[in-house]
Amino acid sequence: MPARKLLSGFLTAVLFTALPAAAKDIVWKQQTITITKNPSRIAVYDPAALDILESLGVQTAAYNDGGQLDPAKLAAEPPELIILGGATAGRLKDTAAIAPTLDLTPDTDSYLTDLAARTMLLADIFGKNKAAEQKLKAVSNKRAILKQRTEGKTAVFLLMENGGFIPQSEDDRFGFFYTLSGLYTPDNADLTHHSEDPPPAPLPEKASSRQKKAAREAEEKRLAEQNARLEKLLAARPDYIAVLNPHADASATRAELQKHPVLGRYSAQTILLDTGSWYRIGAGLDNTARMLDELIRATD
């Protein structure tokens, strides 16, 4: 089952193997746990880790647990290993009291090195080293192809929030875009973050003409300030503009960008990034390959 179909909430995956059990020590960063070798039951609450497991061919029977990590449910039928990451990492103390728990939160500051390390860790647990090496080699080959296309070129990454666009530098949350793509931010690009206020709430039905005028002027000012910042940013003349909208599908976002007074003029060089891959799953194994394929197509 593809990982992207399982992401309406946190996920639990039950993994089955028929290999004999034996104790195995696992060391990961500052964590050391002892698990059953080739565990037959594992609870996964991290989309990137689930993607890696499925990439390696570890058979999973997965279900959505309603978006909540429920320690009581886990304690009722304890797994042999629990994997957390990202939003669920803060529950480590809760789950460690139930079963051995690993926090596999991706380190996107060292994206490719960390991806390889997490992949090989899981491959070692489940005896999938050969598959892991082949998959990692494929990722490396795709990145080499992409870097040939992007050599010497620049981009800005825009995250859509509250009706505005927040630029992302190499040091921001989505800075791994630059690592994967080989693109750089233009030297003179103003990547300063500005708080993007949400659009104002609808006026009451019986709003006065003065209230309506004030609301209209406030909205016009808000949009004008956003557009002025975009104009200043794009004056750096990036080769590409990557846009990620966490809250809408590609068709809706494309329509919004086409009618935008600033970005509408740059449609030929805009890369519209897949929300599931870039925002929901992130640093998985097959998912990284998908992200690279997306960028290869966009820079062709």
Which residue stretches match the model-derived regions?
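Basic- and aromatic-lined ligand-binding clefts that recognize polyanionic substrates
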Residues: 41-45, 49-53, 132-215
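Bacterial Sec-exported substrate-binding components of ABC uptake systems
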Residues: 2, 18-48, 130-160, 245-253, ...
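Flexible loop/hinge segments that line or gate small-molecule binding clefts
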Residues: 92-121, 272
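Bacterial N-terminal signal peptides
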Residues: 8-18
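Proline-aspartate-enriched helix->loop->beta-strand connector
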Residues: 71-87, 100, 230-233, 237-242
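A short, structured surface patch at a secondary-structure boundary
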Residues: 41-77, 81-87
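Structured C-terminal subdomain patch of bacterial secreted/periplasmic proteins
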Residues: 113-117, 236, 240-300
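Short helix-initiation/N-cap motifs at beta->coil->alpha
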Residues: 28, 65-72, 192-196, 210-230
